[in-house]
């Protein structure tokens, strides 16, 4: 079992988010200089801007990138549903900037008092260029982000098992209220 697969299993991303772990790492470098590394702790301040994403990719294939928080809270109770932060599809080769953005990037914003959250990046190799019928979401609102299921999304579009993944952990910091204000929360 690869180190990525071991980290996903140890952190319970398998089975909380996906049934099968990826085996290859996604490199995630943020403009702040922070680097995600299979469960290290970063701050919302460090990850507020969209990262540079790289992964081993076949230049003739298309990929889907999902960024999700499976530790979503409704008030003080953990409700075990995902809140997706970024969704990019039809990525040609590994060039995320040329993919179709279905959900604009929103950085981590764990509510105060909810402890540490897992923030998970998953890449799927698509069977070809696909048509997606999801509502396109901007990064200016939280509408349509909650109650997401990476597993159901992957099943709906026949994406198969994930090919790459990475994650970090984060908890509330002073940037979170600023993020909420920018989202109208």
PLM region descriptions:
Residues 1-185:
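N-terminus-centered regions that define maturation/targeting leaders and the start
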